[in-house]
Amino acid sequence: MTKLSVNINKFALLRNSRGTNHPDLVEVAEKCVKFGAQGITLHPRPDERHAKFSDLPLISKLVNSHSKIEFNIEGYPSERFISEVINTKPDQVTLVPDPPDALTSSFGWNCKEHNMFLKEVVKQFQSNKIRVSLFVSP
């Protein structure tokens, strides 16, 4: 069965552009779940212009308070990203090859070119019992 995971990054961008906690990401995620989402996705970028790494434990706590709701963290596997994901222990991590200055994710991994790098990164997440998904180019 197909499941819906809602990416709440644009709400984080709006919050950050206002310089306040409005909209509150925890409230947004709670409403998504209330209206039928089976997962919440966040993509913290190195510059934290959307989701912030400090959002991860807050959303994780919310997701863990619901049965059958998953948490997916997506992003480029930098050292900080890997560490934050392993500490948060989401259900899934989606690896995206976007450079730190990219406005949005516009292409996927070239698995042949990045084979060894991806194997090493995937192994780290799998050893921490985190399911891995890759954003790939056809």
Predicted regions and their residues:
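Catalytic beta/alpha-barrel core
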Residues: 40-49, 70-78, 92-98, 105-115, ...
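A short acidic, helix-capping loop that chelates divalent metal ions and anchors anionic groups
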Residues: 12-17, 101-107
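Conserved N-terminal beta1-alpha1 strand-loop-helix module at the mouth
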Residues: 1-71, 76, 86-89
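Short Gly/charged-rich anion-binding patches and loops
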Residues: 27, 80, 120, 138
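A short alpha-helix capping/helix-coil boundary motif
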Residues: 7-10, 37-38, 98-102, 120-125
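Glycine-rich, aromatic-flanked loop segments that form ligand/cofactor-binding clefts
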Residues: 81, 86, 93
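Surface-exposed amphipathic alpha-helices with a cationic face
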Residues: 57-64, 119-129
